[in-house]
Protein backbone atom coordinates (compact mmCIF):
# COMPACT_ATOMS: atom_id res chain seq x y z
CA UNK A 1 0.00 0.00 0.00
CA UNK A 2 1.29 3.43 -0.96
CA UNK A 3 2.20 5.72 1.94
CA UNK A 4 0.57 9.09 1.42
CA UNK A 5 1.79 12.31 2.99
CA UNK A 6 -1.04 14.84 3.31
CA UNK A 7 0.34 18.37 3.63
CA UNK A 8 -2.05 20.86 5.22
CA UNK A 9 -1.09 24.41 4.26
CA UNK A 10 -1.98 27.27 6.55
CA UNK A 11 -0.93 30.76 7.56
CA UNK A 12 0.59 30.20 10.99
CA UNK A 13 0.34 32.49 13.97
CA UNK A 14 2.39 33.66 16.97
CA UNK A 15 1.90 31.41 19.97
CA UNK A 16 3.47 33.87 22.44
CA UNK A 17 3.52 37.64 22.72
CA UNK A 18 7.25 37.74 21.93
CA UNK A 19 6.55 35.91 18.66
CA UNK A 20 4.33 38.68 17.27
CA UNK A 21 7.08 40.89 15.83
CA UNK A 22 8.96 38.08 14.02
CA UNK A 23 5.67 36.67 12.73
CA UNK A 24 4.66 40.03 11.28
CA UNK A 25 8.08 40.41 9.69
CA UNK A 26 7.73 37.03 7.96
CA UNK A 27 4.25 37.97 6.79
CA UNK A 28 5.15 41.33 5.26
CA UNK A 29 8.43 40.05 3.82
CA UNK A 30 6.34 37.93 1.44
CA UNK A 31 5.96 39.78 -1.90
CA UNK A 32 2.58 38.13 -2.39
CA UNK A 33 1.33 40.13 0.62
CA UNK A 34 2.86 43.49 -0.33
CA UNK A 35 4.23 43.89 -3.85
CA UNK A 36 7.07 46.32 -4.39
CA UNK A 37 9.08 47.31 -7.48
CA UNK A 38 12.32 45.84 -6.15
CA UNK A 39 13.15 42.93 -3.83
CA UNK A 40 15.67 45.22 -2.13
CA UNK A 41 12.75 47.13 -0.60
CA UNK A 42 10.89 44.09 0.71
CA UNK A 43 12.82 43.33 3.89
CA UNK A 44 13.31 46.96 5.01
CA UNK A 45 9.60 47.59 4.53
CA UNK A 46 8.73 44.35 6.35
CA UNK A 47 10.92 45.46 9.26
CA UNK A 48 9.28 48.90 9.28
CA UNK A 49 5.70 47.62 9.20
CA UNK A 50 6.33 44.85 11.75
CA UNK A 51 8.00 47.36 14.08
CA UNK A 52 5.15 49.86 13.79
CA UNK A 53 2.36 47.28 14.08
CA UNK A 54 3.91 45.05 16.72
CA UNK A 55 2.61 46.93 19.76
CA UNK A 56 -0.98 47.07 18.57
CA UNK A 57 -0.87 43.45 17.42
CA UNK A 58 0.52 42.33 20.77
CA UNK A 59 -2.42 43.98 22.51
CA UNK A 60 -4.79 42.16 20.19
CA UNK A 61 -3.18 38.81 21.01
CA UNK A 62 -3.27 39.60 24.73
CA UNK A 63 -7.02 40.10 24.42
CA UNK A 64 -7.44 36.50 23.20
CA UNK A 65 -5.17 34.88 25.77
CA UNK A 66 -1.65 35.81 24.72
CA UNK A 67 -1.24 33.92 21.46
CA UNK A 68 -2.87 32.36 18.43
CA UNK A 69 -4.65 29.00 18.77
CA UNK A 70 -4.14 28.34 15.05
CA UNK A 71 -1.32 25.82 15.39
CA UNK A 72 -3.11 23.81 18.05
CA UNK A 73 -6.33 23.69 16.04
CA UNK A 74 -4.59 22.91 12.74
CA UNK A 75 -2.63 20.06 14.31
CA UNK A 76 -5.86 18.67 15.75
CA UNK A 77 -7.46 18.90 12.30
CA UNK A 78 -4.45 17.04 10.90
CA UNK A 79 -4.75 14.26 13.48
CA UNK A 80 -8.46 13.78 12.91
CA UNK A 81 -8.06 13.83 9.13
CA UNK A 82 -5.27 11.27 9.35
CA UNK A 83 -7.40 9.01 11.55
CA UNK A 84 -10.38 9.22 9.22
CA UNK A 85 -8.29 8.50 6.12
CA UNK A 86 -6.78 5.44 7.78
CA UNK A 87 -10.26 4.24 8.71
CA UNK A 88 -11.04 4.43 4.99
CA UNK A 89 -8.06 2.24 4.17
CA UNK A 90 -5.67 5.00 3.06
CA UNK A 91 -2.20 4.78 4.62
CA UNK A 92 -2.00 8.52 5.24
CA UNK A 93 0.14 10.67 7.49
CA UNK A 94 -0.77 14.33 7.90
CA UNK A 95 1.78 17.15 8.05
CA UNK A 96 1.18 20.78 8.97
CA UNK A 97 3.05 23.35 6.85
CA UNK A 98 2.68 26.92 8.05
CA UNK A 99 3.74 29.81 5.82
CA UNK A 100 4.82 32.44 8.35
CA UNK A 101 5.38 30.66 11.66
CA UNK A 102 6.20 27.28 13.16
CA UNK A 103 5.96 24.57 12.01
CA UNK A 104 7.31 26.01 8.77
CA UNK A 105 6.97 24.32 5.39
CA UNK A 106 10.63 23.24 5.53
CA UNK A 107 9.84 21.18 8.64
CA UNK A 108 6.97 19.39 6.91
CA UNK A 109 9.16 18.53 3.92
CA UNK A 110 11.89 17.15 6.19
CA UNK A 111 9.35 14.99 8.04
CA UNK A 112 7.85 13.67 4.79
CA UNK A 113 11.28 12.48 3.63
CA UNK A 114 12.21 11.07 7.03
CA UNK A 115 8.97 9.09 7.19
CA UNK A 116 9.50 7.61 3.72
CA UNK A 117 6.29 8.77 2.07
CA UNK A 118 5.62 7.42 -1.43
CA UNK A 119 3.46 10.29 -2.67
CA UNK A 120 2.11 13.63 -1.51
CA UNK A 121 -1.27 15.35 -1.50
CA UNK A 122 -1.20 19.09 -0.84
CA UNK A 123 -4.37 20.42 0.76
CA UNK A 124 -4.54 24.16 1.54
CA UNK A 125 -6.77 25.02 4.48
CA UNK A 126 -7.99 27.97 2.46
CA UNK A 127 -11.25 27.04 0.70
CA UNK A 128 -10.81 29.87 -1.81
CA UNK A 129 -7.66 30.31 -3.88
CA UNK A 130 -5.76 33.60 -3.71
CA UNK A 131 -2.29 34.71 -4.71
CA UNK A 132 -1.65 35.80 -1.13
CA UNK A 133 -2.77 32.58 0.61
CA UNK A 134 -2.72 29.27 -1.27
CA UNK A 135 -0.66 30.78 -4.08
CA UNK A 136 2.10 31.93 -1.76
CA UNK A 137 2.15 28.58 0.05
CA UNK A 138 2.25 26.63 -3.23
CA UNK A 139 5.18 28.72 -4.44
CA UNK A 140 7.10 28.24 -1.20
CA UNK A 141 6.57 24.48 -1.37
CA UNK A 142 7.63 24.49 -5.02
CA UNK A 143 10.81 26.40 -4.15
CA UNK A 144 11.70 23.72 -1.61
CA UNK A 145 10.77 20.94 -4.03
CA UNK A 146 13.01 22.27 -6.80
CA UNK A 147 15.95 22.54 -4.40
CA UNK A 148 15.56 18.99 -3.09
CA UNK A 149 15.93 16.08 -5.57
CA UNK A 150 14.65 13.55 -3.04
CA UNK A 151 11.46 15.52 -2.49
CA UNK A 152 11.09 16.48 -6.14
CA UNK A 153 10.87 12.87 -7.29
CA UNK A 154 7.80 12.14 -5.14
CA UNK A 155 4.51 12.16 -7.08
CA UNK A 156 2.44 15.15 -5.97
CA UNK A 157 -1.21 16.10 -6.24
CA UNK A 158 -2.29 19.61 -5.31
CA UNK A 159 -5.85 20.59 -4.48
CA UNK A 160 -6.12 24.17 -5.71
CA UNK A 161 -9.34 25.20 -3.95
CA UNK A 162 -12.52 23.62 -2.68
CA UNK A 163 -14.97 26.49 -2.13
CA UNK A 164 -17.75 24.59 -3.90
CA UNK A 165 -17.20 21.16 -2.35
CA UNK A 166 -20.57 19.81 -1.13
CA UNK A 167 -19.17 18.67 2.22
CA UNK A 168 -17.74 22.09 2.99
CA UNK A 169 -20.85 23.95 1.82
CA UNK A 170 -23.15 21.74 3.87
CA UNK A 171 -20.98 21.98 7.00
CA UNK A 172 -20.95 25.78 6.78
CA UNK A 173 -24.72 25.91 6.29
CA UNK A 174 -25.26 23.67 9.32
CA UNK A 175 -23.24 25.93 11.60
CA UNK A 176 -24.98 29.04 10.26
CA UNK A 177 -28.40 27.44 10.68
CA UNK A 178 -27.68 26.77 14.36
CA UNK A 179 -27.14 30.50 14.97
CA UNK A 180 -30.04 31.60 12.77
CA UNK A 181 -32.40 29.38 14.79
CA UNK A 182 -31.30 31.20 17.96
CA UNK A 183 -32.42 34.54 16.52
CA UNK A 184 -35.56 36.32 17.72
CA UNK A 185 -37.08 35.83 14.27
CA UNK A 186 -35.12 33.25 12.22
CA UNK A 187 -36.87 34.31 9.01
CA UNK A 188 -35.46 37.83 9.30
CA UNK A 189 -31.98 37.07 10.65
CA UNK A 190 -29.42 38.81 8.43
CA UNK A 191 -26.48 36.56 7.49
CA UNK A 192 -23.27 38.60 7.23
CA UNK A 193 -20.33 36.94 5.48
CA UNK A 194 -17.01 38.57 6.40
CA UNK A 195 -14.22 37.42 4.09
CA UNK A 196 -10.56 38.31 4.34
CA UNK A 197 -9.89 41.04 1.82
CA UNK A 198 -7.20 41.27 -0.85
CA UNK A 199 -6.00 44.28 -2.87
CA UNK A 200 -8.33 45.06 -5.76
CA UNK A 201 -5.37 44.94 -8.17
CA UNK A 202 -4.85 41.24 -7.42
CA UNK A 203 -8.22 40.51 -8.99
CA UNK A 204 -8.20 43.08 -11.79
CA UNK A 205 -4.54 42.87 -12.80
CA UNK A 206 -3.29 39.41 -11.86
CA UNK A 207 -6.55 37.57 -12.48
CA UNK A 208 -6.81 36.29 -8.90
CA UNK A 209 -10.02 34.19 -8.78
CA UNK A 210 -10.52 34.87 -5.06
CA UNK A 211 -13.44 37.30 -5.33
CA UNK A 212 -15.32 35.12 -7.80
CA UNK A 213 -14.80 32.02 -5.66
CA UNK A 214 -15.94 33.86 -2.52
CA UNK A 215 -19.08 35.15 -4.23
CA UNK A 216 -19.91 31.74 -5.70
CA UNK A 217 -19.29 30.09 -2.34
CA UNK A 218 -21.61 32.42 -0.41
CA UNK A 219 -24.33 31.80 -2.98
CA UNK A 220 -24.00 28.03 -2.60
CA UNK A 221 -24.04 28.27 1.19
CA UNK A 222 -27.15 30.48 1.20
CA UNK A 223 -28.88 28.03 -1.14
CA UNK A 224 -28.05 25.13 1.20
CA UNK A 225 -29.08 27.21 4.22
CA UNK A 226 -32.48 27.82 2.63
CA UNK A 227 -32.91 24.06 2.22
CA UNK A 228 -32.06 23.46 5.88
CA UNK A 229 -34.17 26.35 7.22
CA UNK A 230 -37.10 26.13 4.81
CA UNK A 231 -36.86 29.82 3.92
CA UNK A 232 -34.50 32.41 2.48
CA UNK A 233 -32.59 34.88 4.63
CA UNK A 234 -31.15 38.26 3.66
CA UNK A 235 -27.38 38.28 3.45
CA UNK A 236 -24.39 40.55 2.90
CA UNK A 237 -20.83 39.81 1.78
CA UNK A 238 -18.05 42.17 2.90
CA UNK A 239 -14.26 42.10 3.23
CA UNK A 240 -12.16 42.63 6.35
CA UNK A 241 -8.52 43.06 7.46
CA UNK A 242 -7.46 45.75 4.98
CA UNK A 243 -3.81 46.88 5.30
CA UNK A 244 -2.07 49.87 3.68
CA UNK A 245 -3.22 52.74 1.45
CA UNK A 246 -4.21 50.82 -1.70
CA UNK A 247 -7.79 49.94 -2.53
CA UNK A 248 -8.98 46.48 -1.46
CA UNK A 249 -12.09 44.53 -2.35
CA UNK A 250 -15.30 46.23 -1.27
CA UNK A 251 -17.56 46.62 0.57
CA UNK A 252 -15.36 46.85 3.65
CA UNK A 253 -16.72 45.03 6.68
CA UNK A 254 -16.64 48.15 8.87
CA UNK A 255 -18.72 50.19 6.42
CA UNK A 256 -21.20 47.38 5.77
CA UNK A 257 -21.77 46.86 9.51
CA UNK A 258 -22.41 50.57 10.01
CA UNK A 259 -25.00 50.53 7.23
CA UNK A 260 -26.78 47.53 8.75
CA UNK A 261 -26.72 49.22 12.16
CA UNK A 262 -28.23 52.38 10.73
CA UNK A 263 -30.92 50.20 9.16
CA UNK A 264 -31.72 48.93 12.69
CA UNK A 265 -30.90 45.31 11.92
CA UNK A 266 -32.19 43.28 14.86
CA UNK A 267 -30.46 39.92 14.36
CA UNK A 268 -27.07 39.75 12.66
CA UNK A 269 -25.40 36.37 12.15
CA UNK A 270 -21.74 36.92 11.26
CA UNK A 271 -19.95 34.22 9.26
CA UNK A 272 -16.11 34.16 9.01
CA UNK A 273 -16.23 32.76 5.49
CA UNK A 274 -12.48 32.73 4.70
CA UNK A 275 -11.39 31.03 7.91
CA UNK A 276 -11.72 27.35 8.83
CA UNK A 277 -10.06 27.78 12.24
CA UNK A 278 -10.41 30.20 15.12
CA UNK A 279 -7.60 32.74 15.20
CA UNK A 280 -6.91 36.45 15.68
CA UNK A 281 -9.26 37.58 12.91
CA UNK A 282 -12.23 35.71 14.35
CA UNK A 283 -11.54 35.94 18.08
CA UNK A 284 -10.37 39.57 18.19
CA UNK A 285 -11.22 41.38 14.97
CA UNK A 286 -14.75 39.99 14.61
CA UNK A 287 -15.68 39.08 18.19
CA UNK A 288 -14.34 42.27 19.78
CA UNK A 289 -13.76 45.06 17.23
CA UNK A 290 -16.62 44.40 14.83
CA UNK A 291 -19.05 43.43 17.58
CA UNK A 292 -18.44 46.77 19.29
CA UNK A 293 -18.71 48.67 16.02
CA UNK A 294 -21.96 46.93 15.04
CA UNK A 295 -23.52 47.44 18.46
CA UNK A 296 -22.64 51.13 18.49
CA UNK A 297 -24.06 51.46 14.97
CA UNK A 298 -27.41 50.04 16.08
CA UNK A 299 -27.31 46.26 15.57
CA UNK A 300 -29.31 44.69 18.41
CA UNK A 301 -28.18 41.06 18.46
CA UNK A 302 -24.71 40.20 17.13
CA UNK A 303 -24.05 36.49 16.77
CA UNK A 304 -20.93 34.98 15.28
CA UNK A 305 -20.89 31.53 13.70
CA UNK A 306 -18.01 29.48 15.08
CA UNK A 307 -15.19 28.40 12.81
CA UNK A 308 -15.28 24.88 11.39
CA UNK A 309 -12.26 23.74 13.43
CA UNK A 310 -12.72 19.98 13.93
CA UNK A 311 -16.45 19.86 13.15
CA UNK A 312 -16.93 16.23 12.06
CA UNK A 313 -18.74 16.90 8.75
CA UNK A 314 -15.96 19.32 7.80
CA UNK A 315 -13.22 16.76 8.50
CA UNK A 316 -15.19 14.23 6.46
CA UNK A 317 -15.26 16.73 3.61
CA UNK A 318 -11.48 17.14 3.79
CA UNK A 319 -11.08 13.35 3.70
CA UNK A 320 -13.29 13.23 0.60
CA UNK A 321 -11.06 15.83 -1.07
CA UNK A 322 -7.92 13.80 -0.38
CA UNK A 323 -9.49 10.52 -1.49
CA UNK A 324 -10.74 12.06 -4.73
CA UNK A 325 -7.35 13.61 -5.40
CA UNK A 326 -5.63 10.24 -5.03
CA UNK A 327 -7.91 8.76 -7.66
CA UNK A 328 -7.02 11.44 -10.19
CA UNK A 329 -3.86 12.48 -12.06
CA UNK A 330 -0.89 14.28 -10.56
CA UNK A 331 -1.38 18.04 -10.24
CA UNK A 332 1.83 20.03 -9.94
CA UNK A 333 2.38 22.99 -7.67
CA UNK A 334 2.90 25.19 -10.71
CA UNK A 335 -0.42 24.11 -12.19
CA UNK A 336 -2.20 24.67 -8.89
CA UNK A 337 -0.87 28.22 -8.62
CA UNK A 338 -1.47 29.13 -12.28
CA UNK A 339 -3.26 32.40 -13.04
CA UNK A 340 -4.65 33.89 -16.26
CA UNK A 341 -1.87 35.28 -18.44
CA UNK A 342 -2.33 38.89 -17.44
CA UNK A 343 0.62 39.33 -15.13
CA UNK A 344 3.66 37.12 -14.76
CA UNK A 345 4.33 36.07 -11.17
CA UNK A 346 8.09 36.28 -10.88
CA UNK A 347 10.06 34.18 -8.43
CA UNK A 348 10.59 36.20 -5.28
CA UNK A 349 14.29 36.66 -5.95
CA UNK A 350 13.56 37.98 -9.46
CA UNK A 351 10.64 40.31 -8.82
CA UNK A 352 10.59 43.13 -11.38
CA UNK A 353 8.62 46.20 -12.30
CA UNK A 354 5.28 45.35 -13.89
CA UNK A 355 5.61 47.47 -17.03
CA UNK A 356 2.37 46.16 -18.48
CA UNK A 357 0.19 46.84 -15.45
CA UNK A 358 -2.33 49.66 -15.34
CA UNK A 359 -1.70 53.04 -13.76
CA UNK A 360 -3.76 51.94 -10.76
CA UNK A 361 -1.18 49.32 -9.86
CA UNK A 362 1.63 51.81 -10.39
CA UNK A 363 -0.16 54.30 -8.18
CA UNK A 364 -0.62 51.66 -5.50
CA UNK A 365 3.05 50.71 -5.55
CA UNK A 366 4.25 54.30 -5.52
CA UNK A 367 1.81 55.12 -2.75
CA UNK A 368 3.23 52.26 -0.67
CA UNK A 369 6.79 53.48 -1.19
CA UNK A 370 5.80 57.06 -0.38
CA UNK A 371 3.86 55.93 2.66
CA UNK A 372 6.87 53.93 3.85
CA UNK A 373 9.13 56.99 3.45
CA UNK A 374 6.65 59.05 5.43
CA UNK A 375 6.58 56.51 8.26
CA UNK A 376 10.37 56.31 8.27
CA UNK A 377 10.56 60.09 8.67
CA UNK A 378 8.10 59.95 11.55
CA UNK A 379 10.28 57.39 13.30
CA UNK A 380 13.64 59.08 12.63
CA UNK A 381 12.49 62.65 13.19
CA UNK A 382 14.52 63.77 10.19
CA UNK A 383 13.73 64.41 6.53
CA UNK A 384 12.34 66.93 4.03
CA UNK A 385 8.98 67.32 5.76
CA UNK A 386 10.72 68.18 9.03
CA UNK A 387 13.03 70.59 7.19
CA UNK A 388 10.00 72.39 5.74
CA UNK A 389 8.32 72.53 9.12
CA UNK A 390 5.46 70.28 8.04
CA UNK A 391 6.24 67.70 10.74
Curated annotation (Swiss-Prot):
CDD domains: Ferrochelatase_C (cd00419), Ferrochelatase_N (cd03411). The keyword Metal-binding applies. Pathway: Porphyrin-containing compound metabolism; protoheme biosynthesis; protoheme from protoporphyrin-IX: step 1/1. GO terms for biological process: heme biosynthetic process. Its EC number is 4.98.1.1. It is found in: Cytoplasm. GO terms for molecular function: ferrochelatase activity; metal ion binding. Keywords: Cytoplasm, Heme biosynthesis, Iron, Lyase, Metal-binding, Porphyrin biosynthesis. Fe cation binds at residues 196, 281. It catalyses: heme b + 2 H(+) = protoporphyrin IX + Fe(2+). GO terms for cellular component: cytoplasm. It is an enzyme of class 4 (lyase). NCBIfam families: hemH (TIGR00109). Belongs to the ferrochelatase family. Catalyzes the ferrous insertion into protoporphyrin IX. HAMAP family: Ferrochelatase. This is Ferrochelatase.
